[in-house]
């Protein structure tokens, strides 16, 4: 029996937050609204396009929007300036697999069996919100890292829980450790494949900054070690 995606305010378990800026309803606010309010008024006829972007193994202070002078994130800053900027947010797990499974199912890791453990499997019984969007008429897909690491096939799923994969386009990375997946070109392929003005939902799972450490990479990036802010717990 399918475990339904929860139709409550807990449908977005990735954060318990206060936010400092809320202006135009851009991509982030659209996503939050879509996840928190899956049952919309019948009077609403238009369906907003949704672009979900998630980095891998990144702590919240490491963005210039949060005041970091070492890490420059102009794209993230633009979203923060025109949407919502959270300053008290929490993930449900420090591991990739369970954290992403929580996002996809709207449930805590302890509620989703194997999907709540790292690098395991993803039981087919649990509904994922991309599938619900597809049922509602959306064209869905993902590039980069979707749900993982783990084996989603073993439970009988026909595709990654994040949606159909768009990872064919590749590039020559500028630095060692940077993914060779061409996120933007894969997104263009996705848009080309949809029918007309069909509403879309697309997951961009950047593998960065979770990558092997490269000796003296800070010198190549013209950074100074003395500018690194070490967390107090280290």
Regions found by a protein language model. Give the residues of each.
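Formylglycine-dependent sulfatase
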Residues: 27-28, 35, 41-234
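Sec-dependent signal peptide recognition
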Residues: 4-11, 24-33
């Amino acid at each position: 029996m399918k475990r339904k995606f929860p139709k409550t305010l807990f449908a977005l378990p990735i954060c318990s937050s206060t936010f400092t800026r809320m202006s135009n309803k851009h991509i982030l606010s659209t996503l939050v609204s879509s996840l928190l309010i899956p049952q919309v008024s019948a009077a609403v006829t238009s369906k907003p396009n949704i672009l979900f972007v998630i980095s891998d193994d990144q702590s919240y202070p490491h963005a210039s929007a949060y005041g970091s002078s070492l890490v420059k994130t102009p794209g993230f800053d633009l979203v923060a300036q025109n949407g919502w900027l959270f300053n008290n947010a929490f993930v449900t797990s420090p591991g990739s697999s369970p954290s992403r499974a929580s996002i996809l199912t709207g449930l805590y890791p302890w509620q989703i069996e194997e999907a709540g453990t790292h690098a395991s499997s993803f039981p087919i019984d649990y509904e994922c919100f991309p599938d619900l969007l597809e049922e509602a008429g959306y064209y869905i897909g993902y590039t980069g890292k979707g749900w993982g690491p783990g084996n989603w096939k073993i439970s009988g799923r026909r595709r990654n829980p994040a949606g159909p994969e768009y990872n064919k386009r590749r590039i020559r990375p500028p630095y060692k450790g940077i993914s060779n997946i061409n996120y933007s070109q894969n997104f263009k392929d996705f848009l080309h494949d949809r029918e007309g003005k069909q509403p879309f939902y697309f997951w961009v799972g950047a593998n960065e900054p979770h990558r092997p450490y490269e000796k003296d990479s800070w010198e190549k990036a013209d950074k100074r070690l003395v500018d690194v802010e070490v967390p107090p717990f280290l």
